[in-house]
Regions:
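Structural beta-sheet core signal
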Residues: 17, 101, 138-140
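Conserved nucleotide-binding/hydrolysis micro-motifs of P-loop NTPases
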Residues: 22, 82, 106-108, 142-146, ...
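Canonical P-loop GTPase G-domain recognition
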Residues: 144-192
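Conserved catalytic network of the ASCE P-loop NTPase/AAA+ motor domain
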Residues: 8, 52-55, 65-70, 91-95, ...
Length: 192
């Protein structure tokens, strides 16, 4: 749920990077943060548990236009890697405007990808959200690895709704801004 700041004429939109452990969520966010204009981003905050961390920062892209006279500012979050921290994962989804699902392309990670997808559906349903009505691009990360599944196989198992999807090698920045750009534009369109 977007928050409106009338003083600054901004709409704060929340995008959450969700997916399997070690699938590239944090790497995506760190890459965006490292490349974003310092004047257009807030401070990155890391909330650490004993074995996990959740990252957050806000980001004001330059070229997405306005929504009814307001600039769109995006609060970008990651969720903890493991379903063990489901309470935190669920809490981070509260008030979400868009979700970027980060899938690990490695064949041996497919079961974990599917588990993370089911966990996402369950947590959204607990808030009364329907994923078919939320901007929801998918990034297939680690495309450079020799054991990466074909795009056709990934899509058949992880993208039955045919949402916009992107190939990525987040550690090199490939696909990072394409995925975020698509998700951000989808959120702005949903608000217009």
């Amino acid at each position: 749920m977007s928050l409106i700041n009338y003083a600054s004429r901004e709409i704060n939109c929340k995008i959450v990077y969700y997916g399997t452990g070690l699938g590239g969520k944090t790497t995506n966010l760190e890459y965006v943060y490292s490349k974003a204009n310092p004047d257009a981003k807030g401070k990155m905050i890391s909330l650490a548990t004993e074995t996990e961390r959740t990252l957050f920062f806000d980001f004001l892209p330059i070229d997405l236009g306005e929504v009814k006279g307001f600039k769109a500012r995006f609060d970008l979050y990651t969720v903890p890697d493991h379903v063990y921290y489901n309470t935190s994962r669920k809490l981070i989804l509260k008030g979400v405007d868009g979700v970027i699902f980060g899938a690990d392309s490695q064949a041996e990670r497919m079961e974990a990808n599917i588990e993370a997808m089911h966990n996402l559906y369950e947590n959204l349903e607990s808030y009364g959200y329907d994923l078919t009505n939320i901007p929801f691009p998918t990034q297939y990360n680690k495309r450079d690895l020799p054991n990466a599944m074909s795009m056709a196989d990934l899509r058949s198992q992880l993208n039955p709704m045919g949402v916009p999807d992107f190939e990525g090698v987040a550690i090199e920045g490939q696909g990072v801004f394409e995925t975020l750009g698509a998700g951000s534009k989808m959120v702005v369109q949903a608000l217009s």
